[in-house]
Amino acid sequence: MSYLQSVPPHDLAAHLADHDGKSVLRFITCGSVDDGKSTLIGRLLVDAKLVFEDQLTNLGRVGSSGAVNGGEIDLALLLDGLEAEREQGITIDVAYRYFATSKRKFIVADTPGHEEYTRNMVTGASTADLAVILIDSRQGILQQTRRHSYIASLLGIRHVVLAVNKIDLVEFRQSVFDEIARDYKAFAKKLGFASIQPIPIAARFGDNVISASPNTPWYKGPALLEYLETVQLDPPATERPFRFPVQLVMRPNANFRGYAGQIASGSVSVGDPVVIAKSGQRSSVKAIVTFDGNLTTAAEGEAVTLVLADEVDASRGNMLVAPAARPFVADQFQAHVIWFDANPMLPGRSYILRTETDSVSATVTALKHQVNINSFAREAAKSLQMNEVGVCNISTQAPIVFDAYKESRATGNFVFVDRVTNATVGAGMIDFPLRRADNVHWQATDVNKGARSAMKSQRPAVLWFTGLSGSGKSTIANALDRLLHARGKHTYMLDGDNVRHGLNRDLGFTEADRVENIRRVAEVAKLMADAGLIVLVSFISPFRGERRMARELMEEGEFIEIFVDTPLEECARRDPKALYEKALAGKIANFTGVSSPYEAPESPELHLKTVEEDPVALALKIEAFLDRHREEK
């Protein structure tokens, strides 16, 4: 087995040409904590002579405080680059390494084993073709081994190397290796891997890493690197349907219009017909432009600019596709979701959903079940906690373009983003569109919002009163309702307690129920605004994310957030319904301000302080604001 050595300058062109012709294998190392993932990759790189001398010298200095066995270099330090990783002796972030042998190029992602960093493992696995799953010979299959195996399968990885590591610590016994391999294959039978290759390894000493070890004469299979060089991958994405997400419209002069991006799957040639996925507009490829000159054909992974034969309405976020094999365009679908955030995923809560081409508001309409990663059983659940996996129905505010994830990883995935923090809180793999998306259509009506509001001589608005229980929301809203009614305005007041007697009588006060409570009320308020009414919504609505969701349902300028700011002590002193007394005594659970948080508005349209003015004066302030608001319109 030969490896790349230093190349003389005069042979550089030939070397690069040879290098470009090699296939690329992307793989990850994963498994439980301290199974030796980073050490294995470090050993592979060192023994294959793919690490420079100065790197090894530097590792000796960096690792001196944590060196083992009288100064032996800790090979894991080749991958663990963060200071916290070196201090704790664990992997936290995903570490990528690029290397090549005479047969193949490799991109390896060393992923963390701690459950806390599952999100980083998902990141590494999302583009991998193969997973090297490590198991400590002394420990056997652990929960995190199962978790990583399931996630690898879920993310479309088809090939697995089962690296049974630290085989030296069980005296290289074949019986231990055979038992672990047998148990893992039985466990993984339902995961659908195309191949599983068990290999006994002692990563610290290099046994079976790049060559066969004399310590395991009973093992007749390939060494790790030999297997990585020869494993047959799935068919290339060029055989899949053509998908081209438009990233930029190139318009350097009046005579040129091109659509720039990277081909997500498939291939395209000059003259091929294409269609814009959402609009259905058709054209054909006139030219394929690159920095190095025009091409006749381009394939998956290439960054190109496509010039079309016709003038079409395409912009950033559109997708050019093959007319004979179009993706789905729908606003409802089923997906597997892996949750990353410490705050649980709640059905009814609004998130930002981002795909290759779209960024839209989305809601989990149903959590069908949670997946038990040990047994793969489907278990009922009302929410997903951090690192849990569930199957969900998802609804988006506008149709998006997608493929089933099993057909196209690039166009079948998405992430959930928190509306308040902008943190990525979950990742999803789309299974299929829901048929209801095709069967439910908007019914056009002749009388619209403009006609209804004109008849009432008023501008529709949603006045959203938020604040603690006892802050005075309903009192102020009621006073304002009287003022507006006296002026002949058409209003309606939605009060939290009143709505719970009917529409929301089935909801409690858990975080999930509060989210659904606000979602329903926001939709009702939207319908009332569409009827031309001024809607007064008086709800605690403790979460910023739900209030933002309500705002985005309305037209621009229609939603007016009113923060009724009363100190908790004052609310408890008033306690008109004796709720604080019960909450403080532990008789009411999940009570806002006592045992459940309240997220105050950061930039409300109106900020009212009830300890400074009486309800009527505050209602007059809101009335004056509405008058100015109408004039500005």
From Swiss-Prot:
List its EC numbers.
2.7.7.4, 2.7.1.25
Q: Where does ATP bind?
A: 467-474
The positions flagged as active site in the entry are 541 (phosphoserine intermediate)
Alphabetical list of SUPFAM superfamilies matching this protein: EF-Tu/eEF-1alpha/eIF2-gamma C-terminal domain, P-loop containing nucleoside triphosphate hydrolases, Translation proteins
Stretches the record annotates as Sulfate adenylyltransferase: 1-458
Q: Where is this region: G4?
A: 165-168
Described purpose of this protein according to its UniProt entry? Proposed to provide activated sulfate for transfer to Nod factor. ATP sulfurylase may be the GTPase, regulating ATP sulfurylase activity. APS kinase catalyzes the synthesis of activated sulfate.
What family is this protein classified in? In the C-terminal section; belongs to the APS kinase family.
Task: Indicate what this protein is called per its UniProt record.
Answer: Bifunctional enzyme NodQ
Q: Which organism is it from?
A: Rhizobium sp. (strain BR816)
Q: What is the lineage of its organism?
A: Bacteria, Pseudomonadati, Pseudomonadota, Alphaproteobacteria, Hyphomicrobiales
